[in-house]
């Protein structure tokens, strides 16, 4: 059993060093908003997870009422993951819970919409899972049997919305029963975690979350696509300023003997394959970069 969190820009700016020190073992990040734009804190949250080697997946809260909308939502998620160099095989959780838009669609139609999103996500090489509140299962909003092979993450809050500290384990006797094995249980929306101001959703995972996205070749390391390997922080920042989302790191470059330099990274990723794919994609846009395996110092 592993303990983690799911977060969005509702939590504001998160101190991931404190989150990691608190023992958080995985994080599930909101990917795109209803507008189709990235969650305002997605880039910062992903960078924090990567820096502190917290396995990460993403979720999308769906509002789709037609198959075309479901497919478009799925493509928006894929575009974001690819822009951020997230590996094929990363888990995408399809969040099916909006009573106002989804329940009235009926069982058959909602089932078809979820299938439409699943097809797009899996065709892009990502894994697909379903998140629901227990009430969605109990009320039979869609045909769960059609998704028997998909991981299932279920919310059930048993503590009357009282504050729960992250280091307090939930009562396993209150785990939701859905007639099949659960990937995870979201057990409160009023959790408190060091490094996060206010409430956060707390989760239990019953399968090793390390496979949600791969890690670097050495404990504490990541791969990156660097557009500037320099000695001075100011030069790295100047290079990074030309590219939205480009991050500046002081890092030990493990693939060249651990030399410590400043890097302007246009893609922080878990694997060499991801970094090389980012290199190809940016090269097609006329942006050249060097792939490195690094340990971030600051």
Region spans (language model):
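Anion (oxyanion) recognition and catalysis
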Residues: 50, 122, 178, 242, ...
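Acidic/polar low-complexity segments and flexible, solvent-exposed patches
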Residues: 216-298
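Substrate-binding cleft of extracellular glycoside hydrolase catalytic domains
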Residues: 1-25, 29-116, 122-124
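Functionally critical loop-and-helix segments that line ligand-binding/catalytic clefts
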Residues: 1-17, 144-218
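Short, charged, surface-exposed secondary-structure boundary motifs
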Residues: 37-39, 162-168, 257-258
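Catalytic domains of cell-wall/extracellular-matrix polysaccharide-remodeling enzymes
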Residues: 89-171
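Active-site-proximal beta-strand/loop segments in catalytic clefts of secreted hydrolases
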Residues: 5-10, 29-33, 59-64, 94-99, ...
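Hydrophobic anchor at the start of a short beta-strand
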Residues: 56, 127-129, 152, 245-246, ...
